[in-house]
């Protein structure tokens, strides 16, 4: 899967702080379709490190409860692209952000034969912004694989501690 890169530059310090997972999409919906699906994660916070890596604080359902995890995304030569070791070795890349309201990112597992892509729309607040959601949908259409959308914004589905 080759994904078009839309962000040339990334100011890592500006993505720091609280975020909320507003929508998720995946090339294989089984990665997201249940509470315990492997990539059904709720981003809480992004923390740039002094080495320009990115610590991702997320929540995920485990053993019937919501558990917090931290994942380190290691910088690569490409400004908006990181390597992570979550579930398997994957790449994370930022598709688009305005830093203040929204951030779109995708996680790609490039290991054949199970190549898969999962993307999320993050927002600084829990208010749904239809313009941002439309922009996320347009961004998904630029991807080389068909993405199935899931909106986990209903409170009972959000993994809250």
Curated annotation (Swiss-Prot):
CDD domains: lipocalin_beta-LG-like
Primary location: secreted
Disulfide bonds: 66-159, 106-119
Alphabetized UniProt keyword annotations: Disulfide bond, Milk protein, Retinol-binding, Secreted, Transport
Molecular-function GO term, any one: retinol binding
InterPro entries given in the database record: Blactoglobulin, Calycin, Lipocalin, Lipocalin_CS, Lipocln_cytosolic_FA-bd_dom
Statement: the UniProt record of this protein carries the keyword Cytoplasm: no
Domain of life according to the entry: Eukaryota
Pfam families: Lipocalin
Tissue specificity as recorded in UniProt: Synthesized in mammary gland and secreted in milk.
Record has Disulfide bond as a keyword: yes
GO terms for cellular component: extracellular region
Places the protein is found: Secreted
Subunit structure: Monomer.
Family as reported in the entry's similarity comment: Belongs to the calycin superfamily. Lipocalin family.
Function: Primary component of whey, it binds retinol and is probably involved in the transport of that molecule.
Name of the featured protein: Beta-lactoglobulin-1
Protein's organism: Canis lupus familiaris
Gene assigned in the entry: LGB1
